[in-house]
């Protein structure tokens, strides 16, 4: 099998490529065709999607919203060249946030700075008394000052505008509409 250079980052994408490779081999596809296909794959929308640059900082968006996905995405992001890794995270649903609150703190350890937007409610209403401020508090309990809660996208954008520097990596993450921050 020829050596393959993937265009998508992350160990999880290596496993995906290996599964695709195995399926292709079972189907009798030539190794060179497999290599060409895997090397041409640039990923999918909202999965470590390069959105552009802002004053020399790279903006990337990812749909990750479960702690395991978040940790995998941040692990991939750490291998991406950057000075500081900013994670702009929007928790998805009140029930998920409450149920997985301790895991979010651990999953977000891979970022240098975590900026939190309000929870994306989707189909829910807030009956659990949980907010993104609770996620920030959980992170800051172990890593003081690492996480900051903002009530609006405009506040997050203002913070990024003031503090992000050339060479930084800004990763918007969540299943809701947090990608809009990276587009502004």
Predicted segments with their positions:
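ATP-dependent carboxylate-amine ligase
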Residues: 9-12, 19-46, 50-184
């Amino acid at each position: 099998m020829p050596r393959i250079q993937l265009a998508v980052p992350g160990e999880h994408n290596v496993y995906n490529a290996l599964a695709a490779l195995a399926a292709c081999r079972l189907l009798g596809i030539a190794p060179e065709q497999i290599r060409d296909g895997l090397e041409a794959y640039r990923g999918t929308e909202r999965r470590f999607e390069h959105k552009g640059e802002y004053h020399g900082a790279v903006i990337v968006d990812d749909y990750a919203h479960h702690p395991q996905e978040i940790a995998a995405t941040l692990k991939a992001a750490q291998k991406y060249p950057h000075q500081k890794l900013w994670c702009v995270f929007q928790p998805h649903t009140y029930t998920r946030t409450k149920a997985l609150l301790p895991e979010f703190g651990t999953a977000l350890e891979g970022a240098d700075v975590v900026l939190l937007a309000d929870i994306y409610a989707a189909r829910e209403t807030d009956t659990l008394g949980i907010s993104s401020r609770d996620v920030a508090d959980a992170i800051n309990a172990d890593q003081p000052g690492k996480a900051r809660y903002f009530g609006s996208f405009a506040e997050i954008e203002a913070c990024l505008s003031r503090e992000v520097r050339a060479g930084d990596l800004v990763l918007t993450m969540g299943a809701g509409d947090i990608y809009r921050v990276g587009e502004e």
